Amino acid sequence: MPHIRHLAQQCRDAARILATLSTDAKRRLLETMATALNTDAATILAANAADLDTARTQQVGTAMLDRLALDPQRLAAMADALRDIAALPDPVGQVTRDDRRPNGIHIQKIRVPLGVIAMIYEARPNVTADAAALCIKAGNGIILRGGSEAIRSNIAIATALQRALRLASLPETALILVQDMARHTMLELLQLSDLIDLVIPRGGEGLIRFVAEHARIPVIKHYKGVCHQFVDASADIEMAIRLLIDGKTTRPAACNALETLLVHTDIAPRFLPAAAAALRPYGVQLRGDHATCTLLPDVLLATDADYAAEYLDLILAIRIVPNLDAALEHIRRYGSDHTEVIVTADPAHADTFVQQLHSAVVMVNASSRFSDGGALGLGAEIGISTTRLHAYGPMGLDALTVERFVVRGQGQVRHCPLIHLHRDVSVANMPPITS
C-alpha cells in the first residue's frame, strides 16, 4: 500500500474536485454508491462473515459482535441510508448571512467544505459507508481508518464505493481506506496537519484518548455514552418505565443507550420494584447503591466504577438521590456529556435540568434513543460529538462544512483617502496611508 502521506495528498487533490461538484452531480454519485452496495451484497456479507469468525475465535464480547455484524437487512439499510443522504439539502453554498454595510460593501457568509476529514473508528462497518457518503455530500475528501476486527468488511464496502466514483469519472482517491492496521501508520496519519483538516475518532475510550493525545490536527471526539435517566419525584411511573425499557433494551450496544438510572428518593419505593419487574424479561442485570439494594434485595451492590461505565450491554447502574441537585451533581461527576434524560411533571425542574447540564443532548420526558441524527431531523449523522466546538451533539452535513466570508465591493477602501489620479500624478506621489 502506498505511503500514508502520499495517500493523504491524493485525497486532498481529489477533494478540490469534489468541492466544485454540483448538487445534482453529488446526488447521482451517492445513488450510484447505494446501488454498488446492493450489487456487491454477497461479497460484502461474505467478508463480514469472515470478520465475525475471526472475532469469535478471539472471544470478542457480544456488544462488539453486534456492532460488527451485517446481515441482508442491515446492508440494505446501509444502501437506503446513502439514498437518503443523496436526497438531503446540499449545505455547500448555503448563505447563512447576507448584509450590506453603510459603505456599500456586500457581505455574505457561505458554507464551504472543510477539505479532508479523517475518520478513525472501531467495528461498525456501516460507518464506512455512512461517513464516506456524508463527507462526499458535503464536498469533502474522506480518509477512513477502521478497526482490524472489520478490515475485510471495510475493504469490500470501500471497493464498492470507489467503483461508483470511477463510474462518475471522479478520482477514487476521494475516498481512502487505510488498510495498514499498524499503530505507527495511524500515528503518522495524525501528524498530517498540512493535508488533513479534521479528525473524528469514534470508538472506545482508549482509541479516543490515543487520538486526542497524538493528533496535530483538530479533533472532534465522539466519546463514550454514559447516558442517564433521572426519575423525578413527580414523574409518571408508567412513562418512566416505558422510557427506561426503550433506552436500555432496544439497542444496548448503541452509544445513546441508558447506562445509569437515578431515582428521587420520594418515588423510589413505588418506582423501582415496578421498573425491576419490567426489565426482568429482557435479562437486564441491575447494580445499585445500598438504598437500592434495600428495596431490591436481588440487585448487586454497585461500585464507583459502575457509575462511570459505558456497559454497551444489558447492565444498568442505579442510584437513589435525595433531590434534583444530587442528580445533577452525579451526572456532572460521572457523565460523558453525551445524552441525559429527566422524567418529570414539574416544568421548573425540567428547566433546571436543561439549564444546569451541558451535555450534547438533553431530553425532557423522551427516550435517550432519540439522540440520533435521523431522529433529530438531521437526516443522517457521522457521529455524536461530545467536544464543545462548532459541532456538538449529532453531527449532520452542516457540521462537515465551515462558513467563510465573501465580500463584494466597488473599489471601497478602509483607510486610503480618496485620490483622483491624473495623467501627471504618479503612484509614487500618492500620500501615505495612515492607520
From Swiss-Prot:
<protein>
    <recommendedName>
        <fullName>Gamma-glutamyl phosphate reductase</fullName>
        <ecNumber>1.2.1.41</ecNumber>
    </recommendedName>
</protein>
<comment type="pathway">
    <text>Amino-acid biosynthesis; L-proline biosynthesis; L-glutamate 5-semialdehyde from L-glutamate: step 2/2.</text>
</comment>
<dbReference type="GO" id="GO:0050661">
    <property type="term" value="F:NADP binding"/>
</dbReference>
<keyword id="KW-0028">Amino-acid biosynthesis</keyword>
<dbReference type="GO" id="GO:0055129">
    <property type="term" value="P:L-proline biosynthetic process"/>
</dbReference>
<dbReference type="InterPro" id="IPR016163">
    <property type="entry name" value="Ald_DH_C"/>
</dbReference>
<comment type="similarity">
    <text>Belongs to the gamma-glutamyl phosphate reductase family.</text>
</comment>
<keyword id="KW-0641">Proline biosynthesis</keyword>
<keyword id="KW-0521">NADP</keyword>
<keyword id="KW-0560">Oxidoreductase</keyword>
<dbReference type="InterPro" id="IPR015590">
    <property type="entry name" value="Aldehyde_DH_dom"/>
</dbReference>
<dbReference type="GO" id="GO:0004350">
    <property type="term" value="F:glutamate-5-semialdehyde dehydrogenase activity"/>
</dbReference>
<dbReference type="InterPro" id="IPR020593">
    <property type="entry name" value="G-glutamylP_reductase_CS"/>
</dbReference>
<dbReference type="InterPro" id="IPR016161">
    <property type="entry name" value="Ald_DH/histidinol_DH"/>
</dbReference>
<keyword id="KW-0963">Cytoplasm</keyword>
<dbReference type="GO" id="GO:0005737">
    <property type="term" value="C:cytoplasm"/>
</dbReference>
<dbReference type="InterPro" id="IPR000965">
    <property type="entry name" value="GPR_dom"/>
</dbReference>
<dbReference type="Pfam" id="PF00171">
    <property type="entry name" value="Aldedh"/>
</dbReference>
<dbReference type="InterPro" id="IPR012134">
    <property type="entry name" value="Glu-5-SA_DH"/>
</dbReference>
<comment type="function">
    <text>Catalyzes the NADPH-dependent reduction of L-glutamate 5-phosphate into L-glutamate 5-semialdehyde and phosphate. The product spontaneously undergoes cyclization to form 1-pyrroline-5-carboxylate.</text>
</comment>
<dbReference type="InterPro" id="IPR016162">
    <property type="entry name" value="Ald_DH_N"/>
</dbReference>
